[in-house]
């Protein structure tokens, strides 16, 4: 995980303009302000692994849905800075590229450098129908599951109904003298 994070950080640009025209400036001398915690990086890599399998199995819709679900969930948390969201994006991208053979680590002058392979992915293993179905099922389970914090509360539909009644309970408690 730390190795993928390090190489993904190397791919983060100092200046990035989103499709909506928003410019994100990244201070590369302060990585700690842009890199996400290890547990979040593990989640990004886990999702990226499924995106890579979808790409190898030629399931572009599932790959896109998997990635978009990750990014939307993280945006909805309003927890990450623009720089951290850019890092999450780059970590996902770098992981997918690594697993699909589009990135190689090449040793040059005693240091390892990332080399992006242009054109078709180097790994061209084809998926069986069984593997393709398994990848589809796993991605759809992720896409259709509740976001991680809500999923920890067990069943997604009942909890939203019960918290409003619980919110009404603290009022009498707060009226104590």
Question: Over which residues does each language-model region extend?
Answer:
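Mid-chain, structured segments of secreted extracytoplasmic proteins
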Residues: 29-72
